[in-house]
């Protein structure tokens, strides 16, 4: 009985701590030409207005789309909000939310065994409205002086992994590092950014939603283009490889060690 009570209290404490961490992210809106991007932002513990900070942009998956400005914090937010990490890596962390009816990228499914890893990308079209707003938000943070332009980082999971690869070629000179998780991208676009910053790619070896071939394809294209790329593939792991990625002990130290050339 005591053991059950202890486990119950442990679960309550864990969920309470996570909720408390997520409440540290302030609710914001970025409005441009009548379009609204809802996002959450975590500021450093000792934030000073005139100091420039690293910025980490995290793009969520399709399951976290909506307009509640809450769901996008489901994965990864606790890692950056952990007090030890905030002390060690002072940074501004941004979690935007894509509306339910939209996506970070425009793509369509094809044969999962074809050369594009099962997806076709509309690279001849402008970015989706949510991604465009994210791009403009990032630029505005640099323009307003709160962001260090040499330490802008981007990563994301699933749909956000696709969004990460997408924003890299649309803003090829903007970021210092990227960490796409269980996503994919356009191999023909990697030359635009391959040699500009390091990339750490993650994927589950048994992913039934976004086949692992998507990341393998991008990693090969990046290596062929001379990129500094790391690849972590988790055997037997399904689509939720973001759990493994965010648990990587070197992830944060790797991210914040990168500076734009």
Identify the role of each PLM range.
Residues 1-22:
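Bacterial Sec-dependent N-terminal signal peptides
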Residues 17-55, 63, 91, 126, ...:
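A domain-start/cap signature at the N-terminus of enzymes
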Residues 46-51, 105-157:
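Gly/Ser-rich "nucleophile elbow"/oxyanion-hole loop immediately N-terminal to the catalytic nucleophile
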Residues 64-131:
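Active-site machinery of serine-nucleophile hydrolases
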Residues 74-84, 182-192, 213, 217:
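Alpha-helical scaffolding within the catalytic cores
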Residues 89-91, 193-199:
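Short, proline-enriched alpha-helix->beta-strand connector loops that line the catalytic pocket
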Residues 139-193:
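Primarily recognizes the serine-hydrolase "nucleophile elbow" in alpha/beta-hydrolase
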Residues 181, 189, 198-261:
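C-terminal catalytic histidine-bearing segment of alpha/beta-hydrolase fold enzymes
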């Amino acid at each position: 009985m005591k053991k059950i009570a202890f486990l119950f209290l442990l679960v309550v404490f864990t969920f309470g701590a996570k909720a408390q961490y997520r409440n540290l992210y302030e609710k914001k809106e970025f409005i441009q030409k009548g379009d609204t991007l809802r996002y959450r932002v975590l500021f450093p513990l000792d934030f000073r207005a005139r100091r420039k900070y690293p910025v980490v942009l995290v793009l969520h998956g399709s399951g976290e789309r909506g307009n509640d400005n809450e769901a996008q914090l489901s994965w990864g937010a606790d890692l950056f909000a952990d007090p030890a990490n905030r002390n060690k890596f002072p940074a501004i962390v941004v979690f935007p939310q894509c509306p339910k009816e939209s996506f970070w990228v425009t793509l369509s499914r094809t044969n999962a065994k074809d050369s594009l890893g099962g997806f076709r990308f509309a690279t001849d079209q402008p970015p989706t409205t949510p991604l465009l707003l994210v791009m403009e938000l990032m630029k505005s943070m640099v323009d307003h002086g709160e962001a260090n332009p040499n330490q802008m980082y981007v990563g994301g999971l699933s749909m956000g992994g696709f969004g990460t690869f997408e924003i890299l070629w649309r803003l090829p000179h903007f970021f210092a590092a990227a960490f796409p998780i269980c996503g994919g991208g356009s191999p023909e676009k990697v030359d635009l950014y391959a040699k500009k910053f390091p990339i750490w790619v993650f994927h589950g070896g048994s992913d039934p939603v976004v086949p692992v071939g998507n990341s393998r394809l991008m990693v090969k294209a990046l290596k062929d283009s001379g990129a500094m790329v790391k690849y972590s593939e988790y055997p037997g792991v399904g689509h939720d490889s973001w759990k493994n990625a965010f648990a990587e002990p070197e992830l944060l130290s790797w991210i914040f060690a990168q500076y734009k050339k």
